[in-house]
């Protein structure tokens, strides 16, 4: 068990990369002091960098078993050569005898919904996760424009699914920052996606880093600017700052683990989720389960004849696509939510969707970023369905959004959650 002591002090943390940060730790009900003896152990807790729960399992795995599977899950901030390789370098130096497997599960533009549905394919199929570093606050905000409930559905779904697959998985959540999120933090408030993801972190006792608030504090102190941080996709200084904060919270957690007699074990899951319709059983529907009608094809599109750029990761992929209005496909599934992971380009149209012989509803594929790019996004057909089996019919609409140049649908995967 962790001892708590009623003592206030300021201690300095020198990161492994040489950046010095002063962290005020007030040993009340949320933070601990650092004293000689066994009464207290040091913990990072400055209001923006929050150590919660336990990192005992990853510490034991890395230091004793000398094996470790570390997963980085998120959008382009994760996919790019940014904070992630810096953390990889730090971990390999911190545990030089440990055989690590590092999984880069970042996909640019994707939100927490896509993350929840692709989790099985991109993360869990690579083996049990010892340490997960996850970020989706920026894309849930600026790309998906998620509601409060939708922010929870994706992020909570990820956490619950990871922990159901391996109840010993340690998790750290990093909330990155864009200009609007920074401006909100500078006013003393919290952007919706950050606030909702932090609710998930508190509910599951997951350590987290509120980068918008931390950056706002450092800008106010005159130690950094938005420009030197590097923007939404951070530059070298911003990525170093994020990596240092990750190193600090991990080091704090592992200091607790090293000083504790607590053994490794399962993380306790709350009896109830924050939102019952979270995507904690998210997965993609196998292509062979889809029944395409005339007009639908499964294969690689003739990209050279299609306007708009596409990212390399999608260029050679086969998937269902159609440009012929009123063409229909269908499939059956068991679960409470259904949608599609799509590429929405300059000619993206609309889908008409019917579930269980109900009314036909229109689903927009075109996105604000579709003008010159076949943009990856997840669109939901329905959430909160009754448990059990359902049938979905999908029809390409004759109409299309005003800004779109066509009626195309390019569906990478259909997605469901039980």
Across the structure, where does each feature detected by a protein language model lie?
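Structural recognition of the beta-strand scaffold that forms the well-ordered cores
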Residues: 69-73, 101-106, 130-136, 170-175, ...
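Alpha-helical scaffolding segments of alpha/beta enzyme cores, especially the outer helices
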Residues: 89, 150-153, 157-164, 196-199
